[in-house]
Amino acid sequence: IAIRKRILQRGLSFAPQATIANGDHIYWDLHTWQGEQAGELSAQGRQSNFDFANRVLGGSNEMALKLAAGPQIVPLYGTTFRSTPIYFLQDDHDHWENDSPLTYPVPWFQLQLARTTQQLYYPEFLPDANRSVGLPYSTTSERGELSESFGTLRYGDLLEVLLYDVRRTLNVGDLNSVFLDRTVENWLAERTASTD
């Protein structure tokens, strides 16, 4: 944490207009993918004692999530970016696993861990009039039209950066393997070709 914090402080010393935190916010792999115990719960997975058949929020699962994720996120970010907008993307470790073809698609419980970690510790992407309706994990709720995986960073007419995480719809293990969901691919192509 100390090294990552120094790197962030160094970046902030340049007074950026915005910051993108590009995933791997937590390291708490539930399974091990090498050696004799491949596919089995890791030491951290056993320690967390998650009830994979139960929901994440409420009870022991929420407590285990907070004990694992909180100490890795809160001390690092805290109020450091209170004057600089920060956009959070998720990566493999944020789904509580190291990247492996054996882990896709992301198991339901681990997807719920990732979603809950995001809801508790870093914001979803704000509404965007140019974001396609129907993108996966983008919803309309009492909190507005938020997206867990797709956002846009704009700097006037100079720059538009499309931010996206395809990990939740990535499927490399089946005959119908897909890297980009068709709706996501269309959104990326439309925004890239757009002049507005």
Descriptions of predicted regions:
Residues 1-196:
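Metal-dependent phosphoester/phosphodiester hydrolase catalytic core
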